[in-house]
Amino acid sequence: APKHPIPVGMNGAVYMTDLQGGQKTGIFYDQRPNHAFAAKLAKGARVLDVFSHVGGFGLAALAGGASAVLSVDGSAAALELAHQGAEASGVGAQFETRKGDAFEVLGTLAESGARFDLVICDPPAFASSKPALEAGLRAYEKLARMAASLVQEGGYLGLCSCSHAADLARFRSASIRGIGRAGRASALIHTGFSGPDHPVHPHLAESSYLKALFFCL
């Protein structure tokens, strides 16, 4: 495999991919259709991409015409690749990164009065097994509550889960509870899953792991 990051095009954006040191293959192709849907909501929008990794949703949003993107992740290496991807996509001036714990950054942004037209959260698996399910659902609810408070009236919130133990119904319920506890009314406008290159095996529940919920608030 190449030792240096390589550019990969997806949904009109360029992603810099570390094939050796990156998570999985360095880029999350399973999210491709959900990136594309988010991009449709992003024209002219100020976007917050939380747990951004190498810029998955944020760079897709800029390709869709977003005015500005703030990408938040705990990995400095991933954020550097995201920045390189923004430069390679010709949108470096509209792209900003912030390294830190996602929940802490969300709290800081709320305290500062920040608001966004589109907020997307794509965390790692909070419920990676059945024993972790209840704690994971509480984490999804907390994330939804904190993220919802940063969405402008009439804006959009995207919430993702890659936890196969948290099925769609449980994840959706936790997300809706969190949004409600933020004092926000919501309408679920889209439910997304993994792309066709990550098919679901009818006899393997673990293959139906990815869910993406998009709400209008």
Provide a role label for each language-model segment:
Residues 77-118:
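S-adenosyl-L-methionine
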Residues 54-67:
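Conserved SAM-binding loop of SAM-dependent methyltransferases across substrates and taxa
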Residues 68-73:
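Conserved SAM-binding motif I beta-strand of class I
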Residues 142, 156-217:
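C-terminal catalytic and target-recognition region of SAM-dependent MTase-like enzymes
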Residues 116-146:
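Mobile active-site "lid"/loop adjacent to the S-adenosyl-L-methionine
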Residues 1-27:
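Non-catalytic substrate-recognition/targeting regions of SAM-dependent transferases
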Residues 44-53:
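Conserved class I S-adenosyl-L-methionine
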Residues 91, 151-153:
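Helix-to-beta-strand junctions that scaffold the AdoMet/dcAdoMet cofactor pocket
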